[in-house]
């Protein structure tokens, strides 16, 4: 019956006006896509250290896992922020800033570790790959910090029960 299809638990809604909400959603989705793309691309170029150096590879793996986690949460949050179910809200909105920070920390570690590798071992004729790798890590870092900042600025509130039914 239609009555049993009504969601009984709490709903949450973003309190921004529709124009701000749309802009925030676009920026969130765009930064999330760029974060994942930059992480994937940085792992697919032959940068010095990425073939045989654990302290360059490990931050990349951490960043990739964190980026996938951010993507999962953003997709789960969806595009309609006017009525987000409680279990979706709890697994996405409060968790996303931490996940984005995790991706940012691993991207920053990737930059530092690649620079350390270059200082200790040189670029081995792959200067372009090394520079591209570092630039992709910088892009990941910027995207992750932007995601974190945007989500922390959004105000979410419970939808009153009378509107929920």
For the regions a protein language model found, what residue spans apply to each?
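Alpha-helical transmembrane segments
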Residues: 54-68, 133-137
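Short membrane-interface loop/juxtamembrane segments of multi-pass integral membrane proteins
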Residues: 83-100
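Membrane-water interface of transmembrane alpha-helices
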Residues: 66-85, 147-149
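Alpha-helical membrane-embedded segments
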Residues: 131-146
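Canonical alpha-helical transmembrane segments of integral membrane proteins
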Residues: 27-46, 103-114
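Alpha-helical transmembrane segments and their membrane-interface junctions
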Residues: 107-133
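Short, small-residue-biased leader/transition segments that mark boundaries at the very start
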Residues: 2-6
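Cytosolic juxtamembrane helix at the C-terminal end of the final transmembrane segment
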Residues: 80-81, 142-163
């Amino acid at each position: 019956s239609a009555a049993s299809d009504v969601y009984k638990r709490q709903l949450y809604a973003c309190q921004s006006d529709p124009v701000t909400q749309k802009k925030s959603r676009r920026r969130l989705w765009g930064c999330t896509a760029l974060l994942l793309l930059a992480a994937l691309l940085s792992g697919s170029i032959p940068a010095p250290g990425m073939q045989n150096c654990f302290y360059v590879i490990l931050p990349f793996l951490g960043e990739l896992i964190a980026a996938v986690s951010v993507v999962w949460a953003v997709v789960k949050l969806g595009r309609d922020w006017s009525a987000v179910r409680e279990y979706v809200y709890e697994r996405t909105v409060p968790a996303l800033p931490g996940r984005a920070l995790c991706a940012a920390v691993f991207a920053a570690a990737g930059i530092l570790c690649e620079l350390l590798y270059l200082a200790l071992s040189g670029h081995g004729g792959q200067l372009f790959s090394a520079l591209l790798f570092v630039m992709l890590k910088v892009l990941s870092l910027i995207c992750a910090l932007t995601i974190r900042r945007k989500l922390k600025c959004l105000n979410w509130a419970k939808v009153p029960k009378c509107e929920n039914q």
